[in-house]
């Protein structure tokens, strides 16, 4: 996914009200930008860090700038815009980047499924294969004390994520292919695990899902102010 024009940089002053952040441009101008990430953003929103933002040409937007990337004091880049995860996953599947998902004829998004009134992020189908249900999650939480780049999901208790695991488990049990796809959007993360210390129920449900046949894939992104794209698989350890 390319950013046209390229993202512009600024210094983060503060994030507040979940959806907003104040930044300072190199010129000294203060500006309020939109933050699409409503999560805890642990390690991703430290005041003083460098951030990159995009600009919308929609005249109806109250805040035309959107926060896209952060850079930590250690030099790691993070895509904090959670809306990008699904876009990156679709792009990677269509470009055959994810080898495990090659060979399907049709890709649909936001299709209703399951018994808990959910919408699957991506549904793949082909005449010679079972349907493939893919739930996409964004991983941005790095254990900063880990020398091996240990990343975790989730970064806060997620009842919605728990529901998605139950739905995927049901799909696997009924003969469909079910996949949890972690898009790793932090340049410092080299492997991913369920965050049992943050959401023990999610971790337990994920183990149950794997036992039922749900596949877990982790693909890491390359991040710059001109482009973000998934490039390679990394290890999942549960």
Swiss-Prot record:
One of its GO terms (molecular function) is DNA binding. InterPro entries: SfsA, SfsA_C, SfsA_N. Transmembrane segments: none annotated. It comes from the Bacteria. Belongs to the SfsA family. NCBIfam families: sfsA. This is Sugar fermentation stimulation protein homolog. It comes from Vibrio campbellii (strain ATCC BAA-1116).
